[in-house]
């Protein structure tokens, strides 16, 4: 797998889970002899919603809710076969979405 790189993009609502998962991936890749660039924190996407408090009247009384989506990006340069096998066997928390691309 010479001159290849693996790009990993992590997405989660909880920043602690995503940082823990990124640290596990970095440790696994370094243990197998690959070079890791990152994790790079990408901008947090914030979705805001306005919801009426009352079911009948009081249009001016509203609750504001938000969902924050945290993103991390990392590249594994010159991965070995051990690196790919170790990454496939890695057990990450359920709240973390992982996208892996080979380039």
From Swiss-Prot:
Pfam families per record: Ribosomal_S10
Keyword vocabulary terms for this entry: Ribonucleoprotein, Ribosomal protein
GO cellular component, one term: ribosome
Superkingdom in the source lineage: Bacteria
One MF annotation (Gene Ontology) recorded for this entry: tRNA binding
InterPro entries reported in the protein's UniProt record: Ribosomal_uS10 (IPR001848), Ribosomal_uS10_CS (IPR018268), Ribosomal_uS10_dom (IPR027486), Ribosomal_uS10_dom_sf (IPR036838)
Family (UniProt): Belongs to the universal ribosomal protein uS10 family.
HAMAP family per UniProt: Ribosomal_uS10
Self-association and partners: Part of the 30S ribosomal subunit.
PANTHER family (UniProt xref): 30S RIBOSOMAL PROTEIN S10 FAMILY MEMBER
Role according to the record: Involved in the binding of tRNA to the ribosomes.
Protein name according to UniProt: Small ribosomal subunit protein uS10
Organism: Polynucleobacter asymbioticus (strain DSM 18221 / CIP 109841 / QLW-P1DMWA-1) (Polynucleobacter necessarius subsp. asymbioticus)
Underlying gene: rpsJ
